[in-house]
From Swiss-Prot:
It comes from Candida albicans (strain SC5314 / ATCC MYA-2876). Belongs to the PGA14 family. Keywords: Cell wall, Glycoprotein, GPI-anchor, Lipoprotein, Membrane, Secreted, Signal, Stress response. Glycans are attached at N97, N101. Induction: Induced during cell wall regeneration and upon milbemycins A3 oxim derivative (A3Ox) treatment. Expression is also regulated by SSN6. It is a lipid-anchor; GPI-anchor. This is Hydrophilin PGA14. Coiled coil: none annotated. It is found in: Secreted, Cell wall; Membrane.
Length: 131
């Protein structure tokens, strides 16, 4: 069925349903209920009490597991006389490893791209023939 046919039938049926039945034109009464009058307060029942006092187990505190050790931090004091020596050591180490024996070539990159595109085309044609 077409969408327009379904939409037209739906509109006609909703109009027919809206016309039937008597309407109440009287004034509605409003009832106001405050939160303090209900049975729930802050997510708990107001009228119930705990049967026994909870015991402190020592493993949980404030809803979290309390056996996790605190992180240990240490403070290291650095003298001004140590900084130039360490800076020179870093520069010297960097200059020793400046050369590398690796070479790169991009001469055959176009061939590899063409082969992969050709393979993808063959796979696409094969899939089309199967379907």
């Amino acid at each position: 069925m077409k969408f327009t046919t379904v939409a037209t039938v739906f509109a006609i049926s909703s109009l027919a349903a809206a016309k039937g039945g008597e309407k109440d034109h009287g004034k509605a009464s409003t009832v106001t209920k405050y939160v303090t009058e209900t049975t729930h307060r802050y997510g708990r029942f107001d009228k119930t009490s705990r049967s026994k006092k909870p015991k402190e187990t020592g493993t949980h505190r404030y809803g979290k597991f309390n056996k996790t050790p605190r992180p240990v931090t240490t403070t290291v004091l650095v003298k001004e006389s140590d900084l130039p020596k360490k800076r020179d050591a870093v520069v010297a180490r960097d200059s020793k490893n400046a050369s590398s024996n690796s070479t790169t070539s991009s001469g055959n990159n176009g061939v590899a791209t063409g082969v992969s595109l050709g393979l993808a085309g063959v796979l696409a044609v094969g899939a089309a023939l199967v379907i």
